[in-house]
């Protein structure tokens, strides 16, 4: 055995053997993510969780609307009010001072007995955060099960509430997918879409094993009992954190239900302008540094191992003997097959489509885009958590 090992070292050198070992280890890390961790999302079934109640509960949908959002009036609110579910209500908290807009909301409210409306003034001197508005919305709601969404998002189905409500049979926190939709299908927009898909995939991969750290802002909920147990949202002066840091305080190993169904999905409109999208991602991603170490490590490890794997493969092709070059190329191809197949299955489960053929573009550029997003703070990022 010693002679064989010495022969290998003499033939390939210590550096060559070390590089080969590094490639194999990094390959193993990548296979763990795409072959095991992310596959859990595709294989997850809510029915595997034990029911805690025997029937779906009444639902209060709560949404905070800031300013004069005409699209909310003409498209989004009718979709919410048109949900096919026996017992639900829509609670709208309007943040603004436009009386005509508020009167239009009142007119709609008068036509729907299951719509509630509250107004919060706000202005240049007094900025009302979303969490402050949601606190008011929760107090106005009449039901125990609360479901949150945002302007700019539309349910994919008239049965959205019905399917999300099934989660409350099995948990007090309910999380469902939300996908980003851009104005066109250019390569730039595909990369942006895949960056958001990867973030959602990471979150769902943790949520299905009871390690919830994030939920889409447009598609999550919890019970009033949990809310009251914390005396409401924390960090009220900060306009972010309600869908991640606050949920991390609420979540336990047994109280989260993940609903993965095309009917439970929500579609969020995104700007196709690069600078606006990057600013959006930076702002809502600025809570990341407050995540626990295990969560941050899970997210970073895939990205770092991917970059190092690519770098090691390039070095191997450049300097190693032919047989090791071929071995490195074979591992790279095998990894990519696993990555694309896993991503295809997970994308279908989360409501994404047309991923496989162009996935190599994101596979190569994704870490660079994430670095660009994380290399600077949003102009609106809060400096102090209070």
Regions from the PLM with identified roles:
Residues 1-53:
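N-terminal membrane-anchoring/stem segments of glycan-assembly enzymes
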Residues 71, 151-166:
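Acidic donor-binding/catalytic loop of UDP-sugar-dependent glycosyltransferases
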Residues 77-87:
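Short, acidic, metal-binding catalytic loop of nucleotide-sugar glycosyltransferases
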Residues 94-105, 121-122, 153-154:
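A conserved acidic beta->alpha catalytic loop
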Residues 118-129, 133, 137, 143, ...:
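Long helical/loop segments within the catalytic core of UDP-sugar-dependent glycosyltransferases
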Residues 146:
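Short aromatic/hydrophobic "clamp" motif used to bind/position activated sugar donors
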Residues 174-199, 228, 234-298:
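Catalytic donor/gating beta->alpha subdomain of glycosyltransferases that bind UDP-sugars
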Residues 306-382:
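Membrane-embedded multi-pass helical conduit in multi-pass membrane proteins
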